[in-house]
Curated annotation (Swiss-Prot):
Subcellular location, principal: membrane
Family: Belongs to the tetraspanin (TM4SF) family.
Listed name of the protein: Tetraspanin-20
Keyword entries, A-Z: Membrane, Phosphoprotein, Transmembrane, Transmembrane helix, Vacuole
Organism encoding this protein: Arabidopsis thaliana (Mouse-ear cress)
Length: 281
């Protein structure tokens, strides 16, 4: 299918935006590999000192009643799934018995793995965007728009988690690599630059999504118009063939009749000449 100049222009802009996002994703992956190498070849950060065990209470019935109260509070939280999920995300479990992300058994460099997963996800979505911009296909553009929307929602959820929960670092598992604290300190020292970088990244992603939706809307009517033109041209060509078919048959039959007539005339003329030459001989 041929594409007009407008389709090619929008696709070229979408390729440029995807190239910028691919650069961001590759940078995240390279930085994650560097952090993992630093963690593997250097002494990891010591874990925080564990709290001393609480002194045993002389009254065993009091401790038993406290455990019953904790079990009841957990069961009450399970009855309300929305509150339970919000308690998991925000870490507000109601006291020490609340379930938070620190209770999860994660590998030691979990922050590095999560950071690398974000870079890989950005690169995958970017590759799909390149394919969609090159093919200018409706299905590819629709799939790319869905993935880009999900990626933006995940990023918005992470930002919302940090903004809503003022003590979000206490709700996350302990990072023995120390890279989370280093990244946070770097962002706090260069908060103005990081704000502008974040705004530019979000603007690039939103503009990519908008271009994909516009290009998807432009491709669909064009494809339907071409299908309608094909459907209109096929009956016309068939009707033209039906009209021209008898004439072609008549022409071929007429030419064959003329050839037969000429061959008969030649045979007759040849016969007459032979008869005229025999008496003279």
């Amino acid at each position: 299918m041929r594409h007009n100049c407008c389709h090619v222009s929008f696709a070229s802009i979408l390729k440029i935006l995807n190239f910028l996002q691919a650069f961001i994703g590759i940078s995240i992956i390279i930085y994650s590999i560097w952090m993992l190498d630093q963690y593997n070849h250097h002494v990891p950060v010591d874990p925080p000192p564990s709290q001393p065990p609480a002194a045993s209470s002389p009254d065993s019935s009091y401790s038993f009643s406290n455990s019953i109260i904790e079990i009841n509070s957990v069961s009450d939280s399970l009855k309300n799934p929305i509150d339970f999920v919000s308690g998991i995300v925000l870490g507000s479990g109601g006291g020490d018995s609340g379930f938070n992300l620190r209770s999860l058994d994660l590998p030691a460099p979990w922050f590095i793995y999560c950071f690398m997963a974000i870079g890989i996800l950005v690169c995958i979505v970017t590759i799909i965007g390149f394919i969609a911009a090159e093919a200018i296909n409706g299905c590819c553009l629709c799939f790319y728009s869905i993935l880009k929307t999900l990626l933006i929602i995940i990023e918005a959820a992470l930002v919302g988690f940090i903004v809503i929960d003022r003590h979000w670092e206490k709700d996350l598992p302990y990072d023995p690599t120390g890279e989370l604290n280093s990244l946070r300190a770097f962002i706090e020292e260069n908060i103005d630059i990081c704000k502008w970088v974040g705004i530019v990244v979000v603007a690039i992603q939103l503009l990519s999504l908008l271009l994909a939706l516009v290009l998807r809307a432009m491709v669909s009517p064009r494809q339907s118009e071409l299908d309608d033109e094909d459907d209109f041209e096929n009956p016309m060509s068939r009707a033209r063939d039906n009209l021209l078919g008898p004439q072609a048959n008549q022409t071929s039959s007429g030419s064959s009749n003329i050839d037969n007539w000429r061959s008969r005339i030649r045979e007759k003329y040849g016969l007459i000449n032979s008869q005229s030459h025999t008496p003279s001989a």
